[in-house]
């Protein structure tokens, strides 16, 4: 399902889905391919790409390039999330919550690939609604983008990190 390879820049690349689509014209059908990929450095940076082309390798290459261009930073907390987060994209809803050391990535399919390349090692996650890989990936990235570190919350509220954490 998910194919992984290391690159010179130490980015992890995962191929989540390849799909054959067709366009019907007067002379018959024209087939093309779509590819969904995620790219991450395993340390809080992650991006996804969706490429379309007449051949599979070209679609994968386009998707990888788009993924590298659209990377976001995720504030992780020792290999897990800062707090429980929800992400939504069209019909897909995802819920992710931090887990203790040794739990692993408890998530399905497309969500697992995103969390692995982002550098999350311990998380409990569930996808609700549509399980279309494109929508699940977008919802997962939406949830990760909406996650705030205690430092970010403290800066927004004008308080110290200790006040936010209740220490």
From Swiss-Prot:
In this chain the S5 DRBM domain maps to 11-74
Q: What is the effect of changing residue 112 to G?
A: In strain: NEA-314; neamycin resistant
Annotated PROSITE patterns = RIBOSOMAL_S5, S5_DSRBD
Answer whether the UniProt record assigns the keyword Transport to this protein: no
Asked if the Swiss-Prot or TrEMBL record annotates the protein with the keyword rRNA-binding, the reply is: yes
**InterPro entries, alphabetized:** Ribosomal_Su5_D2-typ_SF, Ribosomal_uS5, Ribosomal_uS5_bac-type, Ribosomal_uS5_C, Ribosomal_uS5_N, Ribosomal_uS5_N_CS, Ribsml_uS5_D2-typ_fold_subgr
Give GO MF terms, alphabetically.
rRNA binding; structural constituent of ribosome
Instruction: Recite the UniProt keywords alphabetically.
Output: Acetylation, Antibiotic resistance, Ribonucleoprotein, Ribosomal protein, RNA-binding, rRNA-binding
Task: List this protein's GO terms for biological process.
Answer: cytoplasmic translation; maintenance of translational fidelity; response to antibiotic; ribosomal small subunit assembly; translation
Q: Where on the chain is N-acetylalanine found, per UniProt?
A: 2
GO cellular component labels: cytoplasm; cytosol; cytosolic small ribosomal subunit
Quaternary state and interactors: Part of the 30S ribosomal subunit. Contacts proteins uS4 and uS8. With proteins uS4 and uS5 encircles the mRNA as it enters the ribosome, which may play a role in mRNA helicase processivity. Can be cross-linked to mRNA. In collided ribosomes contacts ribosome rescue factor SmrB.
- Domain observations: The N-terminal domain interacts with the head of the 30S subunit; the C-terminal domain interacts with the body and contacts protein uS4. The interaction surface between uS4 and uS5 is involved in control of translational fidelity.
Query: HAMAP family recorded for this chain?
Result: Ribosomal_uS5_B
Q: Record's NCBIfam families?
A: rpsE_bact
What the record says about family reads: Belongs to the universal ribosomal protein uS5 family.
Additional detail: Altered uS5 proteins have been identified in a number of mutants. Some mutations in uS5 have been shown to increase translational error frequencies.
Q: What does this protein do?
A: With uS4 and uS12 plays an important role in translational accuracy. Many suppressors of streptomycin-dependent mutants of protein uS12 are found in this protein, some but not all of which decrease translational accuracy (ram, ribosomal ambiguity mutations).
Record protein name field: Small ribosomal subunit protein uS5
